[in-house]
């Protein structure tokens, strides 16, 4: 929860390239904080969380927040990370392929979470969430040019 809560704060504070980046990242951060504040169903307690609300309500808020969180991350990867300027370099095209693969992987992971929930496989949810976060991590590191030897455009000298 500490890592997710910290990531939520980071997302809410992050200023992107355009206003839509700010809106999407702020909403994603709020969803992350709600995931932390409202525990999911565990069957042990009647009231839970910081606000001591009934388990069923907390679980609904948690699940809806998780859907928004993962959905907005996927939107970020598929539509915001792939935005380009006037000139699309060959390396930007390669990065966009990575973003699309990761975004599609996240969407498939979200669909898998629905299937896991329908068939009530509790441990499967954690695994599929981890896969979705892995895809986002790859896309985020690619967007951040962490791999300068891999698909990065040369920096313009000023």
Where do the PLM segments sit?
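Alpha-helical transmembrane segments of polytopic membrane proteins
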Residues: 1-4, 59-70, 96-103, 126-133
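Membrane-helix interface and helix-disruption motif detector
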Residues: 19, 55-63, 118-127
